[in-house]
Every structure is written in structure tokens, then in C-alpha cells.
Amino acid sequence: MKLSLGIDTGGTYTDAVLFDEERGVVAKAKALTTRHDLVIGIAGAVDAVVASAAVKPGDIALVSLSTTLATNALVEGRGGRVALVFIGFDEADAQRAGLIEALQGDPLIFIAGGHNPHGDPQAPLDLAALEREVAIVAPTVSGFAVSAYFATRNPEHEIEARDLIVRQTGLPVTCGHELSAKLDGPRRALTSVLNARLIGLISGLISAAQAIMATHGIDAPLMVVRGDGALMAAAVAKTRPIETILSGPASSLVGASYLTGIRDAIVSDIGGTTTDVAVIHDGAPHLDEHGATVGGLRTMVEAVAMTTVGLGGDSEVIVVTSRVTPVVQLGPRRVVPLCMMAVDHPDLVHRALDQQLLSDPPGDQDARFVLPITDGGASAVGLDLSEADLLQRALVGPSTVAKLVRGHADVGRLTRLVKRGLVMIAAFTPTDASHVLGDYVAFDTSAAEKGARLMARKRSALGTAVADGATEFSEWVVRSLERRSAETVLEVGLAIDGFEGAGLSRHPLLAASLEGRSGVVDVAARLTLPLIGLGACAGIYYPAVAKLVRADGVIPNDADVANAIGAVVGRVRVHSTVYLSQPERGRFRVHHLDAQVDFVDLANAVVVADTIARAESLQRAGEAGAADAEVSVEHAFTTAHIEDEDYFVEGTVTATASGRPRLTR
């Protein structure tokens, strides 16, 4: 029996599955994700799933990991200090594509060199100047990024610069041409900088994951999921970590297609913190053709086109009472559900809730608690005296918000401590509402019911209670989540059809459709694609969401671990692109890493380009961990019609090699 171990680090939970291609999921387990150190959560999930299945280490032939580390690091601005060697560019180029913002004050070195669009040198590479500049900055950085003008047409200057830096410093170097074959030098440079910054972080995670495998005696290849859903060997991921951004969402799409057998669908994955909505087309994730955007920076990385909203089972529920008609606001902040907090602190939670229920009118901070985070890795550096004082009081132990804060100013300070990751709030959530309604019962239902009663007693602008008891309030919360989810799904569908715009789903006509209102004109928006719901709570909410958008709803078995399944059922897939140009009439040039070769006949040039692309894609697929890869090739040519004759301008030959990963080494 050969098993695969799939691991996914989500925003709230880290999932692990043991998977057999014939039997499906053999065992699954969850552990809380530890954002400050993902390894802790990974170890917990792996320990639990291996113990529950009682398997032998030798039975595990493949381990695959999807991780939020790269995405989170870029959003939070974390990573190593890097130097960018910018060859053939000028100051104006550095102002484009958010490059200066991405550098965050890290060294930027301008060096003469680069090529023209046909791959001919526009200036000699100034190696002497490069050697001097590298000597100055090397002691202050953890790596280098190198980007040269038109390196996608001729990368020789990037390669020469890389070799010099490695000889001189021994530090890792990322070259732009290795990450993307597309034009746009500044954005390719930005992608290279981000990649170089992530190398240390991803290398550390992979080494730790391999240590966990060794602890269990697992001797198997370790793969990492890319942002397009494909797999790559851990050794490749260490050098190209930027390609792991959005790997978790991509993995969920691969898992969704596998679990359902559906090749075209909208997929919505609801977790504790967020809901991710995307599309699968022909069994593969629909990719963002413009490159993935993370932390406000648009990269040149092919990754899943994903819409993410701060809406999950653990979203904070706030009742907005300033309007004549009160509304429920969900998220975007994640909090600890009352039903979960009561499991760890039953006396505190029930005593406080019971006391608050005796008070009338209800307080603004009813059903809200503060939990200190003592092992979150967050720093208290930079707090002012009042914030530091509030933090010290919070660190004493769990408390009600009402007891901790000493005035309105403290409420703002508490919010800042939460954003810094120093404390967490426990409050009423959709998870609590589901406990009250009996749809999901895993924790303390009594605490959830008391919290719902307190929330229902809040007063509207007219002075009346916002809901008639715990059940009515909980139904209101669940309906609000379902409505928000349906709006997000509709917006993704409309974007696919070319109708984009924030809040488009709240247009009066679409609102009428979602509310089921009809008159002389019957307005009914309907998804033509199936809607696949993923996540531990998808079965609770998504039958209703599918009904709202008039779609065929599908919630597969093991929807709660689809991401981890996607990590092991995916394929290795790599692309190799060879460019062709016509520098002058009758001379056709093949642009390749080793040399630029000219031909007098276009057909011969295409044959050579095809051969090179096939061989290179097979080699790279093998390095990425594929076994018995298959190759397909696409040609794309641009021509101009001049004087009644078609004139070849340029073209590409792209080979794609794909195969399942090799099993036990």
C-alpha cells in the first residue's frame, strides 16, 4: 500500500490527509495553524493523522505541502534584505511597477549592459562596476536579484552577473529570466526581488517539514504546491519560492475538481477567517492572466485568479444599530467563537454571560472577551505608554472586554493590540449561530445560546430589541452570511462575463433576484456553472447559497480537507518558451539561453525552436519531480500584412511537460 501525505496550512487550521489513489482518504486530521511558526501546526496535524491511521512510515511514498507562508510574508512585508542589480535600466524604470515600494529601502545597483529586442547587446556589461558595488552591499543582504534589459531575449548578462555574485559572495541569486519569459523588465525585476526575499523563509519551512518527516521515519519525496495548482519538488521551491504564492487556494481548486469529477465550476472555500472564490476550467484553476497580486504588488507569477473576502465561520458579528433598520455586519476580523472559548474557560465565560443577562439595558461590550497571546511571535515594540499598560492588564489572563477597558480611548487601544497580534477577541460568530440552531454542535452550545440572547437584546435606533430571542438572532446571522456569500459568488461570475465593479452584486436588479422578488418583470440571476462548496462548514451554509444564485450546488465528501487532497492529487507541470524574431528581412532568429541562432528559413527555425522547447520542458519537469512526463507544444506567431505579403514579426514556441510526481525515492 502506497500512501500520499497531503498537508495544507490554512488561515485557521492546518489539515493533513493520508490518501490512497484507490481508496481515497484513509485518515484526516486538523491542528490550529500557528502563524508565527507554521511548523508547530504542521507537526500537530501530521502527528495526529499518522497516529489515527497507524500506518508504517514505509507506506508513505509522497508528501506534498501547500503553504500560506509566501503569501503572508509578502502581505506583511517580511523576508530577507536583498540587493537588486538592475542592468541596462535607468532611474525612471525603477519608478515603474511598484519596484521602489517592493524594495522597501533595500540596495538598488544600476549597471551598464542589457540587450535590444532582437537579443543583441545594447552596451557591454560593466563587470568591474558590478564587482565594486557587490563588495559594498554584500555584508548587509541575504541575497541578490538580477534583472537585465530584454533578458528574455538574451539572458547572457543576467547569467554573467549571477556567476560573478555567487563567486564573490556565495549568496543566493535570483535571475529575472528564470521566473518569467514575458516582457516588462521592471515588473520582472519586482518579481525577482520578492523571490530573493522569500528564499530564506521557504527554505526554513521546507527544512523543518523534512525534519518532521524524519521524526516519523518517512523517507519520501517532498513536493510543494505552486500558485497555479501544479506541484514542484522541494529543492525547486527553495530557489523559486515566489511561485508558491496563493498555493493554498490553488490546491483547493485541484481538490474540488478531483473530489467531484466536475471540470468546469465556481468553487467557494469557506474557512474560519476568509472565503475564497475562484473558477475551475477544464479541470484546472483559472489563472490570472495579468499575474498574481499580493500585498498590493502585481507579480509576473502565474497563479489562480482568486477573490477573497473576510467572511468565515469565525467572523466577528457586529449589529449596526445607527440605522432605523438594524443590520448585521460580518467580519472582516476573525475572533474566537464563544462556544470555543467556553471549552477552555467555562467558569469565566458562563459567569460573565449570566451576569450580563441580568443587566438591562445591555452593555456595548456584552458577550465579548479578551484572550492574551503569549506565544504568537508578535512584538510589543513601539507601543505607547497607554497601550503598554493595557497590554500588561490583558496579559494577566482572559477577561471580559467590559472589565479590561477603562473608557472609550481604551477601546481604540484594544483594537490596535488586536491588529498587532498581541491579543485576541472572543465574541459571537456564525459558528455560534450554527450551534444555537443545531446545525453544527462541536463545542459549548449553552455559551453560544447565551451570547445570542445578549446580542438579540441590543437596541435599534427606535429603542426596540433587534431580534426576538436567540433563535431569531442566529437565523439572522446565518442568512446574512449566506447572502454575503451569494453576492461574492455572483460577482465572480459576472467578472468572468466581463462585468466588473465593486458592489455590482448589490445592484437593485440583482438584489431583487437574491431576495426572490418579482413583479411585472421577473428578475432571476442564475449561475450556469455548478457551485462547489468547500470547507468544514460548507455543508451548513452552501445549500442555501446555491439556491440563492440558482445553481446546482455540490458539497463533496471530505470537503473539509479538499486543500490537503489537492496537494497530493496534482501534477507537475512546467512550461518552456522559445522566442523567434526577424531582425532583418530573411533572417530568422531563435532566442535561447545558450545562444541566439539565425536561420534563412522560418520553417527550419521553428523546428529547432520546437526541439529546444521540448527538451528543456522535459528536463525541467524531471527536476521538478515528474515521472514519465508528457509534452504538448503550442506555436503562436505574429505577422504583418505589408504590400500584399504576410511578414513574420515574431513568435513563440511553448512546450508544456506534465506528469505525476515520482513516488518513494
Say what each PLM segment does.
Residues M1-R665:
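N-terminally biased helix-coil "hinge/interface" segments that flank
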